[in-house]
Amino acid sequence: MIGKIDHIGIAVRSIDEAKKTYEALGLTVESVEEVPAEGVRVAMIRCGESRIELLEPTSEDSPVAKFLAKRGPGMHHLCLASDDVRADDARLRDGGFDVLRDEPTRGAGGHEVQFVHPKSTGGVLLELAGEPHGDEGAADGDADDQQTAGDAADEGDAAGSPR
């Protein structure tokens, strides 16, 4: 079951530059980590009960780098907190939604995550995130054989979906 908005993901060229805006507003970066499976460096900024996630590409061919090249910096995805990602994943599949992974994987902060393609959600890349499991910060999602969340966000335009 979905409980709240967990975070809003924003694609940026540089976390160090982008965080200045949020620091000027009195917010602070809680954590920074690399998620190799997605080819990004991630900074989490607390904002009330939710967070802002800054996504900086770590290679020129990463999905976030492609997103930035096509669309420029800006909102990448909306993440909803789930108390049971696997049950929500099954409910979405049963409802005909296009999820991006064969099963939920581990993302930033060790959270179990699943992504829903923008063509299934009116143009918004949705991420479902559960509680952290195992070693926090260790992301084990295999992006090589599955479509990545960044690729799907970029395809939102190709599918005629709004940004």
List each language-model region with its residue ranges.
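Short loop/beta submotifs within extracellular cysteine-rich repeat domains
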Residues: 18-20, 28-30, 51-52, 60-63, ...
